[in-house]
Amino acid sequence: MNAMDNMTADYSPDYFDDAVNSSMCEYDEWEPSYSLIPVLYMLIFILGLTGNGVVIFTVWRAQSKRRAADVYIGNLALADLTFVVTLPLWAVYTALGYHWPFGVALCKISSYVVLLNMYASVFCLTCLSLDRYMAIVHSLTSTQLRTRGHMRASLTAIWLLSGVLAAPTLLFRTTVYDVETNRTSCAMDFNLVVSQPGQETYWIAGLSISSTALGFLIPLLAMMVCYGFIGCTVTRHFNSLRKEDQRKRRLLKIITTLVVVFAACWMPFHVVKTMDALSYLNLAPDSCTFLNLLLLAHPYATCLAYVNSCLNPLLYAFFDLRFRSQCLCLLNLKKALHASPASSLSSQKTEAQSLATKV
């Protein structure tokens, strides 16, 4: 195994793996990555754990005034929270030069959670967009469809589908020990399904392209169609002076921002991954220079994708007055627990619930 193979021990929990494609190339990792990437991972971990925890608690507390959008946002935060708790493992992995000391089980589970988060996040955003589409474009006829029962069914479908699509990671991800470097990597191993040389190439390319199509391109296209119709309806029919329409505009602005930020964070990751997959199929350049560029860009594209998991709570706080108010009430409640009697706690809770307005 040469320098390139050592580096491509699948240092991130997706289907990106250039060991076959670039076995004749020499590659030297950019040394600052071993220090910079772990620091970024831990920063995302701290911000994501705190921010998404606050979002989940805020959504949970306002049960009586909870909007459909709040439920999807709560599940989006749950997906992000589940993912960020694995980041310390990946930080250690990178800091040790892509050596995995945590065993096979954590290798499989933490890799699975990363893809589960990717699918669940984009599906939650898609359902948010569809909910806004039904509420705005078909406001008079969508009442029967936008019920709690349908919402629960869609959430069940989101998590089941996400779990199934991420399942190949549980099957193929394992630890691989390299005698030459004395390192154990958390990598994809297709020996269970590969019987002839060259078949692994199609498995890697197929899984990579399908995950990008199902976990990014198709949902993003669906969301763009929704917002196209929404934009036309808002332009024609919304009255900027009506309070109900103002609330709908604010919520629409928040959700649109979430979608745009998600696309911006994940697009470089999917571009790098897709170009790598296409090079396997001889549909993209396979020169050492091009492959080295992909390998150098991949950890940072991955890191940018992970940043999305800590940005959403900041976006809620910046754009959503309702969310900010509830967070302030939450802080006041904590103070009241230490400084006020039970009556103060009750009044604070009533104030927090009164801030919620259905849209």
Curated annotation (Swiss-Prot):
GO BP annotation list: angioblast cell migration from lateral mesoderm to midline; blood vessel development; cardiac muscle tissue development; cell migration; coronary vasculature development; determination of heart left/right asymmetry; determination of liver left/right asymmetry; endodermal cell differentiation
Superkingdom as given in the UniProt entry: Eukaryota
Signal peptide: none
Membrane-crossing residue ranges in chain numbering: 37-57, 76-96, 109-129, 152-172, 214-234, 252-272, 287-307
GO molecular function: apelin receptor activity; mechanoreceptor activity
Stretches of the chain found on the membrane's Cytoplasmic side: 58-75, 130-151, 235-251, 308-359
Keywords, ordered alphabetically: Angiogenesis, Cell membrane, Developmental protein, Disulfide bond, G-protein coupled receptor, Gastrulation, Glycoprotein, Membrane, Receptor, Transducer, Transmembrane, Transmembrane helix
Protein task: G protein-coupled receptor for peptide hormones apelin (apln) and apelin receptor early endogenous ligand (apela), that plays a role in the regulation of normal cardiovascular function and fluid homeostasis. When acting as apelin receptor, activates both G(i) protein pathway that inhibits adenylate cyclase activity, and the beta-arrestin pathway that promotes internalization of the receptor. Also functions as mechanoreceptor that is activated by pathological stimuli in a G-protein-independent fashion to induce beta-arrestin signaling, hence eliciting cardiac hypertrophy.
Family listed: Belongs to the G-protein coupled receptor 1 family.
UniProt-recorded name of the protein: Apelin receptor B
Originating species: Danio rerio (Zebrafish)
